[in-house]
Amino acid sequence: MKNVLVYCRQGFEKDCAAELSEVASSKGFYGYAKVVPDAGYIVYNFDQADAGETLIQQLNFNRLIFARQIIAVNDVIELEQGGRVESLLEAARELPLAEEIWIETADTNDAKALSGLIKKLEKPLREGWKRSGVLRNKAVGVRHHVFMLDGEAAYLGVSYAACRSEFPMGIRRLRFPAAGPSRSTLKLEEAFLQFVPEQTLEADLTEGMTAVDLGAAPGGWTYQFVKKGINVIAIDNGPMQKELMSTGLVEHEKADGFKYEPPYTVDWLVCDMVERPIKVAELMAKWLASGWTRRAIFNLKLPMKKRYQEVTLCLQTMEGLLRKAGVSYQYQVKHLYHDREEVTVCIMVK
C-alpha cells in the first residue's frame, strides 16, 4: 500500500499533515498530503509503491501528536449500491491477512450520518471476510480498516499493533463523573491513561503523594488526584468546589500560578492555565529544572494557525532549558480526544 490515511480532530488537518510530512521525510519517504478542511482526516500520497505500509511499521504511534489513528491505504474504492460488500472484499484480497476488521468514519457531523449504513454493513462484511479466508487468527496484530467516506466511497487499509490506537476511530471515550467540578477533569483522566504506563501506575500515582495544580479552580484536575488519595496544593485566585475542599486533601492557596514556588519538591505538577504556550512551556521547564517536581502534565493552548510549528518551538525551548540544567527526562505530547485547541504534554524526570 502506497499511501497513509491519518484520522485527526476536525480542523487540525493541516497540522496533522505538517507533522506527518516531517516524520516521513526524516525516514526517507517523500510525497504530498491531500488535505480537505474540516474533513477529520488526511491522506498522504507517496511515490513508492509500498511506502505507506513500510512507513507505518517504522513509526511509534505514541510519538505522533495529532494522529488519532494511522493506517496504510491505496486509492479510494468506489462502492455501488447493492454491491458494497463485494467491492470491498475484492480489494481486501490484495491486503495482508488480518485477525479483525473495523468499520469506521471520520469524527464529523457529516460522517455521523453514516452510522445507520455502517450498522447494516457490519455483519455482512465480517461474514464475507471470514468466508473468504481474509480473516485468520494467526494474523496476530494485523487489522483491516474500512474507512467510509460516504455511501459510495471508502478507503480500505491496514494497521499494525506496534503503531496504532486500540480505540475505534482512535477515540478514548470517558464518562464524565457526577462529582466532577468541570468537564476539564476528563482531560487529565485521559492524560493519565495515555501517558502513565500501566506497569508503573502504582508507583507514579500513589496515595499520599503531593501534587500542585496551577490554575486549579474550580478543581477539575485536582479532582483526579483526590479520587486517588493524593494531596493537592491548588493554586488559583478563584474558588474551588466545596466538595473537594471538604475531603481534607486539598490546600487552596490564592496566588498567581506563574509566581508560586512550592515549599518542597512535589510528586506532580499539573497546569491547564490559559496563557501563551511558550510562557507555559518556560514555566514548566523552570519547575523541572529547579527540582520542584519530578513529573508534569500540562496543556499548551495553541494559536489558530501553524499549531504544529508552535508545539515544536515549545518543545525545543523546554529541551534547551532542561539540557542546560542537566535534567534527564522523557516526554510525550498528544492531542487528546478531550483536548480542544490545545495539546497535552507529559514530562517525567528519569
From Swiss-Prot:
Gene3D superfamilies: 3.30.2300.20, 3.30.70.2810, Vaccinia Virus protein VP39
Subcellular location: Cytoplasm
Residues engaged in binding S-adenosyl-L-methionine: 184, 217-220, 236, 256, 272
Cellular component terms per the entry's GO annotation: cytoplasm
Chief site of localization: cytoplasm
Keyword entries, A-Z: Cytoplasm, Methyltransferase, rRNA processing, S-adenosyl-L-methionine, Transferase
Entry annotation: catalytic residues: 301 (proton acceptor)
EC class name: transferase
EC code(s) of this entry: 2.1.1.186
Family note: Belongs to the class I-like SAM-binding methyltransferase superfamily. RNA methyltransferase RlmE family. RlmM subfamily.
Subunit and partners: Monomer.
Protein task: Catalyzes the 2'-O-methylation at nucleotide C2498 in 23S rRNA.
Name under which the protein is recorded: Ribosomal RNA large subunit methyltransferase M
Source organism of this protein record: Marinomonas sp. (strain MWYL1)
